[in-house]
């Protein structure tokens, strides 16, 4: 029961720090004097880092077990959320948000692993996963409420500090209650290895390409700015190399292509890609009037 409460709270906090930040972003932009061209980065860098490192950190959890990756992710998140509240300029805030983005990449896959190991296949397990998913929108709306309340009644800094306090309490509880599965994982997954070529192509490819697309609209010469062209081309080359590595080189790829073999899986992935992309655009621009 304690494990379930911990992972539900973790899911809630993950969405809390996405939705709520967009609410306080206008006030943060004024307080830290963020130039218009950089206002998108404190909001987007968090999700960018999470998405880029999700697969490598998930593989680390496969090798060393979910317990340590999950709990250390919570500790890391608590630290950098607390630091973000003390930001004195927008560069410090962007760095804190970027480093904090590594934490969801750690506990997103491990929460699924922990729940999967705890419950046997069947209706009860399906219900547990359904409830877990339901806490994402709950955390989303809590983030909006707390973000608005702190910006109006306190200061935007308390949005981060309150979140870090809850994260710290969740860290302590997880250390005391979640069973350590490292020894078990080392035995069960003794043959599992890190796909280093996948890491070296997927991570920089996602980061460089997303940076070029995001920053191109605010660069001095738009998408014709030299550094935008260079980063975009490099990102595409890295992603193309990642497709080749994952499909024909890696013995244990981070993203096996057979994941997309089930009927409609490829179409579902494409539709979710565009759905989340459009939602992110709406969420950002809805914060500014």
Each language-model region and where it sits:
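12-transmembrane solute porter fold
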Residues: 6, 22, 226-227, 252-289
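Helix-loop-helix hairpins in multi-pass membrane proteins, especially solute transporters
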Residues: 56, 60-197
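Hydrophobic residues within the alpha-helical transmembrane core of Major Facilitator Superfamily
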Residues: 12, 48, 82-83, 98, ...
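Conserved extracellular-gate-facing transmembrane-helix segments in secondary transporters
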Residues: 10-24, 205, 209, 213-217, ...
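C-terminal membrane-cytosol helix-exit motif in multi-pass small-molecule transporters
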Residues: 164-184, 203-215, 234-249
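Extracytoplasmic
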Residues: 2-37, 41-44, 52-54, 107-108, ...
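Hydrophobic transmembrane alpha-helices of multi-pass secondary transporters
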Residues: 2-15, 42, 46, 76, ...
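Flexible interhelical linker loops that connect adjacent transmembrane helices
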Residues: 175-203, 218-224, 248-262
């Amino acid at each position: 029961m304690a494990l379930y409460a911990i992972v539900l709270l973790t899911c809630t906090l993950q969405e809390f720090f996405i939705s709520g930040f967009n609410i306080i972003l206008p006030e943060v932009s004024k307080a830290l004097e963020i130039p218009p061209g950089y206002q998108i980065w404190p909001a987007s860098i968090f999700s960018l880092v999470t998405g880029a490192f999700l697969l490598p950190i998930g593989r680390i959890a496969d090798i060393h077990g979910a317990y340590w990756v999950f709990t250390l992710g919570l500790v890391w998140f608590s630290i950098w959320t607390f630091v973000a509240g003390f930001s004195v300029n927008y560069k410090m805030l962007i760095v804190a948000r970027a480093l904090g983005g590594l934490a969801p990449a750690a506990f997103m896959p491990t929460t699924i692993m922990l729940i999967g190991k705890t419950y046997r296949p069947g209706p009860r397990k399906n219900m547990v996963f359904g409830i877990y998913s339901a806490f994402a929108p709950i955390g989303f709306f809590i983030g909006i409420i707390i973000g608005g309340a702190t910006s109006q009644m306190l200061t935007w800094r308390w949005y981060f500090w309150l979140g870090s306090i809850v994260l710290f309490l969740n860290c302590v509880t997880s250390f005391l209650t979640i069973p350590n599965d490292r020894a078990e994982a080392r035995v069960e997954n003794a043959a599992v290895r890190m796909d280093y070529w996948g890491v070296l192509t997927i991570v920089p490819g996602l980061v460089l390409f997303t940076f070029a697309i995001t920053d191109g609209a605010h660069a001095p010469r738009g998408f014709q700015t030299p550094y935008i062209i260079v980063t975009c081309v490099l990102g595409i080359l890295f992603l193309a190399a990642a497709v080749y590595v994952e499909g024909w080189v890696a013995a244990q790829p981070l993203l096996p292509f057979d994941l997309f073999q089930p009927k409609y899986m490829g179409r579902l992935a494409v539709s979710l890609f565009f759905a989340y992309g459009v939602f992110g655009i709406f969420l950002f621009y809805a914060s500014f009037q």
